[in-house]
Design a protein with these regions (language model features):
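A short beta-alpha structural unit
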Residues: 66-75, 91, 95, 122-138, ...
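Zn-dependent metallopeptidase/amidohydrolase metal-coordination segment
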Residues: 147, 151-212
Length: 213
């Protein structure tokens, strides 16, 4: 929940994938143009290309997939020598348009195409934190909405906001997420009110009653 218990119901989550791209060129003194291949130039073009190409248009409940670079590194203490390699780290939050395997193929194709034009080689490492998932609104989800409306008066919005969640480990099982407000989530002294707990308990009780009767 966001501002009050039951104002939102999550019916999916975006996936998260981290990546490291390392570009290998040829080291050399900057005064002797043509004797080196600058991996920094290639990396800059890779970054520009990845940021300029839309990954998708989003879905009804999920925004377009988004890639952000989070770190760039060149292991070079000299200011007038072109380095042998340069690297960058990125994170992608991707919607249900992709599985991580298909997204990896798309990103690798873009990266390698740019590197090839710059006569550089690359190494790309990926780490998937979670796949995107989505449950099509069904009678159970609408039943939960009615329960929330009855208990709280909220007309719960269906969405897929936020980061990854532990429900990503449930595989292809249909699911929804409904819980307490997240206004103090991950903070020191994370807490909730007793009144919110009572509301949520009543919601859960009514959901179980409606589902099993």
């Amino acid at each position: 929940s966001n501002k009050s218990v039951g104002d939102e119901i999550r019916i999916g989550r975006r996936g998260s994938m981290n990546g490291t791209v390392t570009v290998y060129g040829k080291s050399g003194h900057s005064a002797f143009y043509g004797t080196y291949i600058n991996p920094c130039t290639a990396l800059a073009k890779i970054i520009s290309k990845l940021k300029s190409v839309p990954l998708d248009k989003g879905t009804k409940y999920m925004p377009p997939s988004n890639l952000e670079f989070t770190k760039m590194n060149v292991d070079n203490i000299s200011e007038n020598v072109v380095p042998q390699s340069a690297s960058a780290k990125f994170n992608v939050r991707f919607n249900s348009t992709y599985k991580s395997t298909s997204l990896k193929k798309k990103l690798s194709k873009i990266i390698n195409a740019v590197a090839k034009k710059e006569n550089c080689k690359t190494k790309i490492d990926y780490k998937v934190s979670g796949e995107a998932f989505y449950t099509e609104p069904n009678k159970e989800i609408y039943m939960v909405k009615k329960v929330v409306k009855k208990v709280t008066g909220n007309n719960a919005k269906l969405n897929c906001r936020g980061g990854t969640s532990d429900s990503r480990f449930l595989g292809s099982i249909p699911r929804l997420e409904l819980g307490l407000r997240n206004n103090t989530i991950h903070m020191v002294n994370e807490r909730t009110s007793i009144s919110d707990l009572k509301k949520l308990t009543k919601i859960y009780k009514n959901i179980l009653h409606n589902y099993f009767t």
